[in-house]
């Protein structure tokens, strides 16, 4: 397309932030923070960050009113939240709290976001997915139109449409995720890189599903939609710290029609007939990192705390480290040999776990998302050690410290009384257990 435009006398300017190819496009200008001929001091801008800097250059000043859009793009793109990106997000959140962009304000209200506690997680888990949903499933135009509109009636219509598409996106993601999990459950020994494809999988959500599978199975994952008419497979990849997925794709480029992305995420296309060969090549490359991949995620514990130190003033001071994200993760805190109480499962299908840590008269709420099954391994008054992320949980105008559980350990012998007229299957699934009938 660039060559054709140039032939027709059109000057083309290319802006990007993905890894640069060996040969740059023959365009009028290529604007990239890592351009080999440049010396820009911060190489990790998102695509939205590059657009912000172009706007600033054209205007001769920083367009502060556009920092909300740049912040959303920066968080949603999962780039490094250090340096200039950190400034963009921190300032952008302040602009978002002012609610001057009517469409964004309406979307936040519909999604139940309280601007008083708006933060980077509000973007990453609520705003970003909604704006992404329309583009993933159909056309991204309505999201852009919402950000630009001043017509309240049109805004209400667009917000309703985006909310609807987000629900649809969630349903599609859940369906593909379940299908992929079933396929992986059949493999006793997972490969270093999981490669799966299906003609019925919606291409627009494959990256989301791949991320879920990486979190669940601990393997870099590449998922493909196979178009039977064209014979082309288009895919999305998500990785772990152990494997640079862009480098892995570059090593297998002979099998690919095109590819692009970053160390942790990428997209690609290739003839569907070459999927098996591609899987073999990328796994051959990943074999040199096998030990690191199998070992899994390493978690750095920032500090071991007594419950007495977990106070609202401490947590408010901790929030000065925000915004959290890639390369600026939330601090991880550990608690050792603490009794627990009030164990229960919560949420749809009892997917989540909730309990309290207790130290004399002190209590700390603990929430474990997607960890509901762990309740089968816990007893009231068990003494445990655990790690997680601390935050302030605001509910009905009440603020309390809360720990989001990452991992838990119980060294002691446990006794479970599961007497019932029916034996639950989950009871028999407990490892290293002795059963008395």
Model-derived features: positions:
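N-terminal small/polar loop signature for handling phosphorylated ligands or for N-terminal nucleophile
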Residues: 1-25, 30-36, 171, 175, ...
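Mid-to-C-terminal polyanion-binding domains and interfaces
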Residues: 154-158, 164-196, 229, 250-437
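Structural motif
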Residues: 10-13, 28-30, 42, 49, ...
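Fold-independent oxyanion-binding glycine-rich loops
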Residues: 15-18, 33-35, 54, 72, ...
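Short alpha-helices
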Residues: 26-76
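Hydrophobic helix-and-loop "lid/oligomerization" segment in the mid-to-C-terminal part
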Residues: 9, 59-277, 304, 346-347
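Short gly/pro/ser/thr-enriched loop/turn and capping motifs at secondary-structure boundaries
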Residues: 18-23, 37-39, 228-232, 243
